[in-house]
């Protein structure tokens, strides 16, 4: 997620979709924002600049270091934040970032999806990379991008 994301109201991912939904509710002084599901599923998010820095880090690795931690058939590298959050916690964080004063209403008639999505990022961490952008900071940056470029 981050600058350049898809903020379409019907076919975006959860962060850009919620940023837009909370922003529009704030502008309209709506009493609430509807969020799909129960809010219980956990998701991991990675800011776009962190993904880019991970790619550059791996491309710049010395071959000896890379080969020490990988093998021919096991050379894939997961990149993640090593942190997951419930959709409920995410919605509250986005509500705060946007400055929406209304309520969050979970629509339990809509699907939750998988209960947890958190990847194993141990290898990239062993190779010396860790994300730098916190979720809250990334959400603030993404919201500023939305305001500046999507309205």
Set out the residue ranges of the language-model regions.
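C-terminal substrate-binding subdomain of Rossmann-fold SDR/epimerase-dehydratase oxidoreductases
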Residues: 17-18, 24-151
């Amino acid at each position: 997620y981050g600058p350049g994301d898809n903020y379409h109201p019907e076919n975006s991912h959860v962060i850009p979709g919620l940023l837009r939904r909370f922003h529009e509710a704030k502008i309209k002084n709506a009493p609430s924002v509807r969020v799909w599901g129960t809010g219980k599923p956990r998701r991991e998010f990675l800011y776009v600049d962190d993904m880019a820095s991970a790619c550059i880090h791996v491309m710049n690795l010395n071959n000896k270091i890379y080969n020490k931690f990988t093998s021919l058939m096991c050379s894939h590298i997961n990149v993640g934040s090593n942190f997951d959050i419930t959709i409920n916690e995410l919605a509250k964080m986005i509500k705060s970032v946007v400055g929406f004063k209304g309520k969050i209403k979970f629509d339990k008639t809509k699907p939750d999806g998988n209960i947890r999505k958190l990847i194993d990022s141990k290898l990239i961490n062993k190779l010396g990379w860790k994300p730098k952008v916190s979720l809250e900071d990334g959400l603030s940056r993404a919201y500023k991008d939305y305001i500046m470029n999507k309205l």
